[in-house]
Amino acid sequence: PPALEKLGYNKDQISEIIRYAKGSGSLDGCPYINPQSLKAKGFTDEIIEKVDKSLPSVFDITFAFNKFSLGTDFLIKTLGFDKDEINSYDFDVLSKLGFSKTEISSANDYVCGTMTIEGAPFLKHDHYSIFDCANKCGKKGTRFIRPLAHIKMMASAQPFISGAISKTINLPGNAGVEDIKD
């Protein structure tokens, strides 16, 4: 927030930018997947509260909806799934409940955030570079500090340091031998 304040954003704008990146951490007000829609699918207040309490620590909303967080009894006895189904590695509670990929993605962005500032409401495109990171951030992120920029940063700092300098240089996942040679 101090960087956003220095750039001239007001408190409401800062809150929206942060919520876009970090999410709400709650099902309250969430599109598609919320206490009302979950109750309509058989969720109890107790289970909804349990899910909601786990949300601030998950990176994806689906992590809060599994046999470990919901319990096998609830999944089998209340929701009607079978044991083999819930033990499958690719079991997706939200999809099985009828939520579409688009609905789950939208709910995920609301609850867990986009994990990037790119596309945040109010944030000026001219300010994106201030927040660039070593890698692309989130599913929607496209920006990152180029590998050569890491080397240039070290070169700029080296004259002011006595001794060695060490820096991890992050390369994109699709980097090959030719990229390193260049």
Predicted regions, residues:
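Long, C-terminal-biased catalytic regions of enzyme "large/alpha" subunits
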Residues: 1-182
